[in-house]
Curated annotation (Swiss-Prot):
It is an enzyme of class 2 (transferase). Pfam families: RNA_pol_Rpb1_1, RNA_pol_Rpb1_2. Mg(2+) binds at D641, D643, D645. Its EC number is 2.7.7.6. One of its GO terms (cellular component) is plastid. Zn(2+) binds at C88, C90, C104, C107. SMART domains: RPOLA_N. Binds 1 Mg(2+) ion per subunit. This is DNA-directed RNA polymerase subunit beta'. GO terms for biological process: DNA-templated transcription.
Length: 834
């Protein structure tokens, strides 16, 4: 039958095989995840409508009054689309005659289907940069700051500071990132000839020349930071004074001059050839600072990290420092004491990790500044819904003339609002508050000798206005308690209801019930079912038992076509599926299903599908159980057993799919594993145990009472093979045979029960040892260990001694001796004639 079915399908579909080959040769494109720039976030969320207006920016934090004109809130119909198909907030519908008018002139809503609200996104523009919580660990590497220092910075307890130039834009316009690849040629142009002579990396200034200016210059130049000195807190702002300020920041400008000279292939030796001393060079540079530098610009939180990354040379200064040390070590130009040699080796070894990050940033053309957020994408409204539990319409929760905020609505207990909406609202509110406050203080971020006291009096406001934005962004993307607690010890009492942690975007994606696994990877498809598997050894290897009710549901379209071709009125084209159950017990359905299943293979899959053997095809057989029946030999390929495992059934629809299922995926084809070549269709576990259990010789061939047991079994009075039964046995034959042939493949009976002089005596036996003998006359033999092990029965003297003892007690002919065994043991020994 199987051969006939395969040949008939192949003959009907001769040209399908070529189609399969062409399909397998199609190219597959990979999915790459990368950091997106703020401008790309804005471009993907903005939409240009037919009237020329651009929408997408969310500015209002309210959830109500969706019919308001020019509304830009989180559920705006102008941004995300109408609530009702092709209907605006005014109640107007799309004019089929005049299709050129697609936007309502009154409320500004496009005439689109409501499903667009599941696709359109928006964005929130932040006035101040914030660090993305996913990239905190990466920023530690790029900034060479400890985790504690970085969290102090994000918690607004420390800050960055930068020299503020009058011509700041022109000063930072050089393309300094090319120096990363030219640094290997540094010795050719003799670039750092005045700096490499000394140990400029350590704080021990005794090794430097006596010139104090040169000592400070080399020390600050060796810090490796451009525009950043770590751990500067609010209490040390008074250090900004005249010449000391210049010495503290000159090294950073000196690097700029050095890199610029290197790009132009100019050596610093030109100053020596022109009789210009290094001291005069420093004084001239200080005059430049005095004229060009007007104040110190400091930044906190994400603004400071953004400004650090925005500088051209800042991103590569750290790796340049490591490359410089490696070049010096290779050329034996570092003359330091032994106590510093190990430290330099450690730093050079760790530099490989930093180069790894910089390499990927450069190759993927990703700017490190994108790790800070300037635009926040807003999900489509249907993915973050508001559910009305009272049955009212949430669009009209605002009464006449009054505006209800989200907190007031939530206290009513009528609405269920997604936590993501709460975080969006908090971000918009605090972003507006911070912008309105700091716009009135334009000089707050610039320090000089005149406004230090003024800035000190306003610094606490930075933390008050900017910290809530960072907390809300962290909670929006990731609710990890460690990440949240690092920013502030204050709990989210205003965001957490009933002590339940809010759900972030990451939480909605990950896990078993996340968007990816629940809606994409584990998506239910049509013509599929799922049930528990049970063992069915009576089936063929290529057969599978499918429940009758499941087959009626899966093959309903094929049944409809089958009866339609035969002009049968039982099923019509638009027949209701629920009425099919009424006819499910009819014989005509059973015969029709059986004829359909002959030419329709099914595909069975067991999750997780780790290799191609996890999905195979079978020929279905109807069963009246509610479980899928499988042959035990095919389970090793699926890595399945019968302890509650479930499998899914898929019905191939097209002829190509049927042909592929039979030719490429049939279970009878997977006799050997494709990876190792080892056999797959082998008996394992319960099959081997069953063979061993049912094929042991129980010495019941001489029993006179086994005929009645077999007769009762054949007549149906006994049908349980594993329930213990007590049967009478011929003790003389059994004991004699057992004692005569102790080393054969016999097993000792489970239990022997004898009735001697009205007292019940029990002998419990094991395969190797006598565990308990209650014959008083044999105590002496037990103490002498004559019968502790059955191998001792090879001693003929002991065998005759035991037999003579039993004969004297008339036990070998006693009919009141019973054997405790099972029906399966009796039947299989008789059936196999062992």
């Amino acid at each position: 039958m199987k051969y006939f079915i395969i040949r008939s399908l192949i003959n009907k579909s001769k040209n399908f095989y070529n189609t399969i080959i062409k399909y397998n040769k199609t190219k597959l494109f990979a999915l790459e995840l990368s950091i997106i720039s703020p401008q790309e976030i804005q471009n993907s969320a903005e939409y240009k409508r037919e009237d020329g207006s651009i929408v997408g920016k969310v500015e209002d934090s309210t959830f109500y009054d969706l019919e308001k004109v020019n509304n830009k809130n989180l559920f705006s119909q102008q941004i995300f689309g109408p609530l009702i198909d092709f209907t605006c907030a005014c109640g107007k519908k799309l004019n089929r005659k005049n299709k050129e008018i697609n936007v309502c002139t009154k409320c500004g809503i496009e005439f689109l289907p409501s499903s667009i609200r599941s696709k359109r996104k928006g964005y929130i523009k932040l006035n101040y940069a914030m660090l993305h919580p996913f990239y905190i660990d990466y920023c530690e590497k790029l900034l060479m700051k400890s985790k504690k220092s970085l969290h102090l910075l994000l918690n607004m307890d420390s800050f960055f500071y930068f020299p503020s130039y009058k011509n700041w834009v022109n000063f930072l316009s050089e393309k300094n990132h090319i120096y990363l690849f030219l640094l290997k040629k540094i010795l050719i142009y003799n670039r750092y000839s005045y700096i490499y002579k000394y140990s400029t990396f350590f704080k021990n200034r005794s090794k430097f020349p006596n010139n104090k200016k040169m000592n400070k210059l080399f020390f600050y130049n060796a810090l490796g930071f451009y525009g950043l000195n770590s751990r500067k807190t609010w209490t040390v702002l008074d250090f900004i004074k005249g010449y000391n300020f210049f010495l503290g920041n000159f090294s950073k400008y000196y690097k700029k001059l050095s890199w610029y000279a290197y790009q132009q292939k100019i050596s610093l030796n030109k100053y020596k050839s022109n009789n210009i001393s290094i001291n005069n060079f420093i004084d001239n540079t200080f005059n430049f600072y005095k004229n060009e530098v007007n104040s110190l610009c400091f930044k906190v939180g994400g603004d400071g990290i953004e400004m650090f990354f925005l500088q051209d040379m800042a991103v590569y200064s750290i790796i340049n420092k490591f490359l410089k040390l490696r070049v010096l070590k290779l050329n034996n130009l570092i003359n330091v004491n032994n106590k510093y040699y190990g430290k330099i080796n450690t730093i050079i070894q760790n530099s490989k990790n930093y180069q790894y990050y910089f390499k990927h940033f450069y190759l993927k053309k990703i700017a490190p500044v994108w790790m800070t957020l300037r635009r926040i994408p807003v999900l489509p409204p249907n993915l973050r819904p508001i559910l009305d539990l009272s049955g009212k319409n949430y669009q009209k929760t605002a009464s006449s003339g009054t505006l209800l905020f989200m907190r007031d609505i939530m206290h009513e207990g009528n609405l269920f609002i997604s936590d993501i909406n709460t975080f969006y609202r908090e971000i918009i509110i605090h972003n507006k508050k911070a912008f309105n406050f700091f716009s009135s203080l334009p000089t707050l971020y610039y320090l000089n000798e005149l406004n230090i006291e003024y800035v000190n009096s306003k610094l606490w406001l930075l933390k008050y206005y900017l910290m809530p934005i960072q907390k809300s962004i962290t909670s929006l993307f990731d609710k990890n308690p460690e990440t949240i607690n690092n920013f502030s010890n204050k709990k989210f009492t205003d965001l957490i209801l009933d002590n339940v942690k809010p759900t972030s975007i990451l939480d909605s994606l990950k896990g078993k019930y996340g968007k990816i696994r629940f809606n994409l990877l584990g998506k239910r498809v049509d013509y599929s079912g799922r049930s528990v598997i049970i063992s069915a050894p009576h089936l063929k290897i290529y057969e599978c038992g499918i429940p009758y009710e499941m087959a009626l549901t899966l093959y309903y379209p094929f049944l409809s076509e089958y009866f339609y071709k035969k002009n049968n009125n039982i099923l019509k084209k638009n027949y209701n599926k629920s009425e099919l159950v009424l006819y499910s017990k009819s014989l005509i359905f059973t015969k029709s299903l059986q004829s359909i299943l002959l030419s329709h293979p099914i595909i069975i899959n067991r999750a997780p599908t780790l290799h191609r053997l996890g999905i195979q095809s079978f020929l279905p057989k109807l069963t009246h159980s509610k479980a899928i029946e499988l042959h035990p030999l095919v389970c090793p390929a699926f890595n399945a057993d019968f302890d509650g495992d479930q499998m899914a059934i898929h019905v191939p629809i097209t002829e190509i799919a049927k042909l592929e299922a039979i030719q490429l995926m049939a279970s009878s084809l997977f006799v050997y594993a494709p990876a190792s070549g080892l056999p797959l269709l082998i008996p394992t576990q319960d099959i081997i145990l069953g063979f061993n259990f049912y094929t042991n010789d129980l010495l019941l061939k001489t029993s006179r009472e086994d005929k009645s047991i077999k007769q009762a079994m054949n007549q149906g009075f006994i049908n349980e093979c594993h329930i213990p039964y007590w049967i009478k046995i011929n003790t003389k034959d059994i004991f004699f045979k057992f004692l005569a042939y102790p080393l054969r493949n016999y097993i000792i009976p489970i239990e022997l029960q004898l009735n001697i002089k009205g007292f019940s005596k029990i002998i419990r036996l094991n395969t190797f040892k006598v565990t308990n003998l209650v014959f008083d006359s044999l105590d002496l033999l037990i103490k002498k260990n004559y019968i502790s092990n059955w191998l001792i029965l090879n001693n003929t003297k002991f065998k005759y001694l035991l037999i003579s003892f039993l004969q004297n007690k008339n036990l070998l002919t006693n009919k009141q001796v019973y054997l405790r065994t099972t029906l399966g043991n009796i039947y299989f020994n008789k059936y196999l004639n062992l």
